[in-house]
Amino acid sequence: MKIGILSRNASLYSTKRLIEACKQRGHEVRVIDALRCYMNINSDKPEIHYKGEELAGFDAVIPRIGASVTFYGTAVLRQFEMMGVYPANESVAITRSRDKLRSMQLLSRRGIGMPITGFASKPDDVKDLLDMVGGAPVVIKLLEGTQGIGVVLAETRTAAESVIEAFMGLKANIMVQEYIKEAGGADIRCFVIGDKVIAAMKRQGADGEFRSNLHRGGTASLVKITPQERKTAIEAAKIMGLNVAGVDLLRSARGPLVMEVNSSPGLEGIEAATGKDIAGMIVEFIEKNAASKRTKTRGKG
């Protein structure tokens, strides 16, 4: 097969591993920077050009689209879909999961457990917003943040009000969530491919750090997940319509709570923690599914 990887940097761990996995399994592989692609939209035959040549003959494409280039990256992916190229994750599913408000609305509509969450832009009554989510302590997030950036734990009502007012000054949309104390600064990353959790790791925040992101000094270790956690992760990925997803769960007194469904989960932490060839599993999934050229949205909404 001829497989394209949409990635801006071929030297990133996840991209390198996917290149290796494609080559090991006998496929032709090419890394494509989506931002450098340009497209013919109006033609009877949709085309993508890159570095002065037409990109043609691809059987499948693996999107590794960074959050900052979601709009153009998914537009390029959509063009590949129009050309009949099989996407490991569909453009509509990526767009859906990148919108934190939309994804949480979809998950809540289907009864998926999640922390009590408030969304706001310019709330008239900050006190009422805090009451609505059960009061302090709360976690306050900028909607556009990734890797733990723009995430603040406010332990008192006064601190929460100050942070919300400061974020409002940035003219940013914000999310206010209950703080799940019993999670102890840890979360579970479930790696879903198709309809299976193929690996899971526990991410523990550094000392004194409530965020468990590995980019912020968190550590990863192998974890055994419960049947309920497995079911929740699979269902969350399915609702988003993602074939490949990293589902982040918190362990709470009322069961697993979904924090986020990531459409471009990193491979380094989870491969190191579990010793599994996850890149190979992604390519194997593509081999089984690309032949049928199925690009119909798996999710609803």
Swiss-Prot record:
Mg(2+) 2 binds at E260, N262. It is an enzyme of class 6 (ligase). NCBIfam families: PRK10446.1, rimK_fam. Mn(2+) 2 binds at E260, N262. Keywords: ATP-binding, Ligase, Magnesium, Manganese, Metal-binding, Nucleotide-binding, Protein biosynthesis. Mn(2+) 1 binds at D248, E260. Binds 2 magnesium or manganese ions per subunit. GO terms for cellular component: cytoplasm. InterPro entries: ATP-grasp, ATP-grasp_RimK-type, ATP_grasp_subdomain_1, RimK, Rimk_N, Rp_bS6_RimK/Lys_biosynth_LsyX. It comes from Vibrio cholerae serotype O1 (strain ATCC 39315 / El Tor Inaba N16961). Belongs to the RimK family. It comes from the Bacteria. One of its GO terms (molecular function) is metal ion binding. This is Probable alpha-L-glutamate ligase. Its cofactor is Mg(2+); Mn(2+). ATP binds at K141, E178, Y179, D187, R211, S212, N213. The keyword ATP-binding applies.
